[in-house]
C-alpha cells in the first residue's frame, strides 16, 4: 500500500464507491458494498468491518476478492478512514479491512478507547488513551507473524508451540479482545469481524468434529420459527444440529464456545443496557453446496431475547467467486452492504435485532458455520411467556461459561 490517500491494492478489487466516476455495480441507486477480503493474518489488530444499509434495501451480488495485498504501511496506523461527510473509503491493515465513512480517524487508528468523538468518551466517563497505549505500540516488530489465536503475544513457531502459547495467554487475551476490539466496533458499527480467532490447530479440530456430525447423520433440515405456509427449503437450505459441547465427539466445539463465552463475558455492561446472562446451544449448520442459501431475515425481529449473534466459520480455502455462500448484512439506516466471506477461523459478531437484516447467498460447496445467540435477561424473561420459541431456543438456555476457580 503506497499511502493512506491511495489505498492500494484493496480498493482496486472493490466495487466503485458512491460519487466515483465509474459506473456503479449495484442495480439500485444509493447502494455501496463493503468487502472483507484477502486478509493477512495479524494478531495485533482487530478485523474491523464497518457498514450499514436500510433494512428494506435488496441484496446485491458478492464482491470480488482482492488478488493482492500489501505488507507495507498500514492505514489503520496512518489514521486513514472513519466517518465525516459520508464519503466511503476502503480501510485495510494486516488482518483488518473495512469500508468506513471518511473521518473518525482515531477510532480506526487506535482500535479501542478512541479520542474521537471526545464527547462520547466523556459520556462514558473515560479519557482517550495516549498514543503509547495503542494496540500495536509494544508489538510493531511482530507484523510479519502469520499465525496466532486470540492472544496478541503469540510468537511465530510450530503449531504446537503456538497453541500452547495461546492457551497460556487465554486469561488475559479475551479481555483485551473484548475491550480493545469488539466493544468499540459494536458500539460504532454494530458488526465486528475477528480472523484467526482460535488458531489453525484448534480450529481444525472443531472442523473435524463438525464433519463427523455430518457423516453421522446428526444434521437435520433447518426449521422456521414462523412463516409455516412457506416451504422451509425455499427460505433456508441449511442442515443443523444443536450442540452443548460436552457430548461425545464435541469437545473442541465446547472449547470454541468457552472461548466465545469468555470474550462476551468481558463485554458485559459495555454494550448498551443489555444484561447478558446466558445463551443458546451452539447451532452447527451446513449448507450442502447444492445452490441453496438463506433469504434475507432478522434473527430476532419480535423480541425473543436474543441480542448478540456470534458466527464462527470453518471453511478452508474458500473462494466466494467460485463457492458462493457470501453472508450479506444490510445494517439499518445506512446505504451500504457488508459482504462477509465465510473464511476458516473467522468470528463474526453483530446485533441480533432489526438493526442487521442479513442473508446467505447460494453456496456451491459444503459450507460450515457454528452460531450462538446470547440473551438479554429482561427481554428473554418476557419472551418466554409471550412467544412460542423455536425448538432450538426453548428450554436450552446455557449459562455463559465462567472462568475456572483458582486453586
Curated annotation (Swiss-Prot):
GO molecular function: 2-oxoglutarate-dependent dioxygenase activity; ferrous iron binding; hypoxia-inducible factor-proline dioxygenase activity; L-ascorbic acid binding; oxygen sensor activity; peptidyl-proline 4-dioxygenase activity
InterPro entries the record matches: HIF_prolyl_hydroxylases (IPR051559), Oxoglu/Fe-dep_dioxygenase_dom (IPR005123), Pro_4_hyd_alph (IPR006620), Pro_4_hyd_alph_FE2OG_OXY (IPR044862)
Pfam families according to UniProt: 2OG-FeII_Oxy_3
Tissues showing expression: Expressed in adult and fetal heart, brain, liver, lung, skeletal muscle, and kidney. Also expressed in testis and placenta. Highest levels in adult brain, placenta, lung, kidney, and testis. Expressed in hormone responsive tissues, including normal and cancerous mammary, ovarian and prostate epithelium.
PTM sites of type Phosphoserine: 130
UniProt keywords, alphabetically: Dioxygenase, Iron, Metal-binding, Nucleus, Oxidoreductase, Phosphoprotein, Ubl conjugation, Vitamin C
Comment text on domains: The Beta(2)beta(3) 'finger-like' loop domain is important for substrate (HIFs' CODD/NODD) selectivity.
Protein name (database record): Prolyl hydroxylase EGLN2
Amino acid at each position: 500500500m503506497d499511502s493512506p490517500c491511495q489505498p492500494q491494492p484493496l480498493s482496486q478489487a472493490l466495487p466503485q464507491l458512491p460519487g466515483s466516476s465509474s459506473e456503479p455495480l449495484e442495480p439500485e441507486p444509493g447502494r455501496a458494498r463493503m468487502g472483507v477480503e484477502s486478509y493477512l493474518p495479524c494478531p495485533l489488530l482487530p478485523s474491523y468491518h464497518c457498514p450499514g444499509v436500510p433494512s428494506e434495501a435488496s441484496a446485491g451480488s458478492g464482491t470480488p476478492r482482492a488478488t493482492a495485498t500489501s505488507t507495507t504501511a498500514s492505514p489503520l496506523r496512518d489514521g486513514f478512514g472513519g466517518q465525516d461527510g459520508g464519503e466511503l473509503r476502503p480501510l485495510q491493515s494486516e488482518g483488518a479491512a473495512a469500508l468506513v465513512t471518511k473521518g473518525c480517524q482515531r477510532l480506526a487508528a487506535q482500535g479501542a478507547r478512541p479520542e474521537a468523538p471526545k464527547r462520547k468518551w466523556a459520556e462514558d466517563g473515560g479519557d482517550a488513551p495516549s498514543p503509547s497505549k495503542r494496540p500495536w505500540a509494544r508489538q510493531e516488530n511482530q507484523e510479519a507473524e502469520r499465525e496466532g489465536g486470540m492472544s496478541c503475544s503469540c510468537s511465530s513457531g510450530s503449531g504446537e508451540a503456538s497453541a500452547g502459547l495461546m492457551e497460556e495467554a487465554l486469561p488475559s487475551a479475551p479481555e483485551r479482545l473484548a475491550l480493545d476490539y469488539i466493544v468499540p466496533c459494536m458500539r460504532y458499527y454494530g458488526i465486528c469481524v475477528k480472523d484467526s480467532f482460535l488458531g489453525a490447530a484448534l480450529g481444525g479440530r472443531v472442523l473435524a468434529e463438525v464433519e463427523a456430525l455430518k457423516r453421522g447423520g446428526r444434521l437435520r433440515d433447518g426449521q422456521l420459527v414462523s412463516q409455516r405456509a412457506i416451504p422451509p427449503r425455499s427460505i433456508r437450505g441449511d442442515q443443523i444440529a444443536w450442540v452443548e459441547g460436552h457430548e461425545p465427539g464435541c469437545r473442541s466445539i465446547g472449547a470454541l464456545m468457552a472461548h466465545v463465552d469468555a470474550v462476551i463475558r468481558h463485554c458485559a455492561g459495555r454494550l448498551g443496557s443489555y444484561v447478558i446472562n446466558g445463551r443458546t446451544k451452539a447451532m452447527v449448520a451446513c449448507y450442502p453446496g447444492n445452490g441453496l442459501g438463506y433469504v434475507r431475515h432478522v434473527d430476532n425481529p419480535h423480541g425473543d431475547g436474543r441480542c448478540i449473534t456470534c458466527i464462527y466459520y470453518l471453511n478452508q480455502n474458500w473462494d466466494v467467486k467460485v463457492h458462493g455462500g457470501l453472508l450479506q448484512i444490510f445494517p439499518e439506516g445506512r446505504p451500504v452492504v457488508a459482504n462477509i466471506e465465510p473464511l476458516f477461523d473467522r468470528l463474526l459478531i453483530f446485533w441480533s435485532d432489526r438493526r442487521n437484516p442479513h442473508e446467505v447467498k447460494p453456496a456451491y460447496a459444503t459450507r460450515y458455520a457454528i452460531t450462538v445467540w446470547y440473551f438479554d435477561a429482561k427481554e428473554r424473561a418476557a419472551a418466554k411467556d409471550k412467544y412460542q420459541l423455536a425448538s432450538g431456543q426453548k428450554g436450552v438456555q446455557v449459562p455463559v461459561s465462567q472462568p475456572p476457580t483458582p486453586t
